[in-house]
Amino acid sequence: MCDDDVAALVVDNGSGMCKAGFAGDDAPRAVFPSIVGRPRHQGVMVGMGQKDSYVGDEAQSKRGILTLKYPIEHGIVTNWDDMEKIWHHTFYNELRVAPEEHPVLLTEAPLNPKANREKMTQIMFETFNTPAMYVAIQAVLSLYASGRTTGIVLDSGDGVTHTVPIYEGYALPHAILRLDLAGRDLTDYLMKILTERGYSFTTTAEREIVRDIKEKLCYVALDFEQEMATAASSSSLEKSYELPDGQVITVGNERFRCPEALFQPSFLGMESAGIHETSYNSIMKCDIDIRKDLYANTVLSGGTTMYPGIADRMQKEITALAPSTMKIKIIAPPERKYSVWIGGSILASLSTFQQMWISKQEYDESGPSIVHRKCF
């Protein structure tokens, strides 16, 4: 079906960033925000060639005059027209390829609605005329990238966090847990606690500034109470950040209070369990015989696991929950921000995977529901 000389395209559409590139590469060629921006004001300069919408980095750079929208919320596509724009931008502007010449591997969140992947399939074949495509589950790809076939993946991105136990390459659906608490919620929370300090951030453009503060300055405390005491008694934890207009702000205990919400969702007014408890609950839903392997292979993946200190804190929290003799190992690969994409690149270039693609012919015969039979 698929010639060896044509590289497959791997597109990992995250809620926050889109990662795209060619199968067989060790990193994505294009990484850009999953944003579509539309002008807030009428264009007045004639002949300026203003567009009615901007995608990705261009939207980001013109954010002052645009309203920014994320078409993927909590890992699920909520606006298909905008999603199509992002894919179009990915193929034609970022990768500069003709999608009708390459098989495309897409990714999706676990426990995604079935209609969501059908629609993805339909758009790929009908709008972009791809010769073949496949939809893979993000967490499974992360595990591939870490060189394992058994383990539990805590995948936390911008829109959704999930814990996915995988045994010998099979995700165990009954034990997958999903937590709608991720990077975007932490950004919103940081906006809120910075407002309490007297800095006001409200617009969609300012939210992007706060996201940058979060990525550059936040970290996870090993002992939250102790860290709060340290922050209160000295200024050793304070850092300054220069805003785009040159104003300098000081950030103190917000640096670790923001990601602490991952472990204590009550900070955000949520009743759910933290990421440590969710991982533990997920392991406990698995067969007793495989738990040992899961505890010893807990893999972190996604941008929201990039905070310094998060692996040590997870180790501490899970050790407290697990049986006392259990060996617990948290694996936090340095490239975990892109491990979903890397796993996709590995998968799509395996010779054994080539018969797994859904071909245009199969799609024409069966329609979009083919995706449930071929991708699992």
UniProtKB/Swiss-Prot annotation:
Residues bearing the modification N-acetylaspartate: D3
A single MF term (Gene Ontology): ATP binding
Record InterPro entries: Actin, Actin/actin-like_CS, Actin_CS, ATPase_NBD
Enzyme class, broadest EC rank: hydrolase
EC number: 3.6.4.-
GO BP field: cortical actin cytoskeleton organization; embryo development ending in birth or egg hatching; locomotion; meiosis II cytokinesis; mitotic cytokinesis
Subcellular location: Cytoplasm, Cytoskeleton
Catalytic activity: ATP + H2O = ADP + phosphate + H(+)
Claim: Acetylation is one of the keywords in the record: yes
Pro-peptide region(s): 1-2
Transmembrane segments: none
Keyword annotations: Acetylation, ATP-binding, Cytoplasm, Cytoskeleton, Hydrolase, Nucleotide-binding
Note: In this organism there are four genes coding for actin. The sequences coded by genes 1 and 3 are identical. There are a few variations in the actins coded by genes 2 and 4.
Annotated family: Belongs to the actin family.
General function of this protein: Actins are highly conserved proteins that are involved in various types of cell motility and are ubiquitously expressed in all eukaryotic cells.
Protein name in the entry: Actin-2
Lineage, top ranks: Eukaryota, Metazoa, Ecdysozoa, Nematoda, Chromadorea
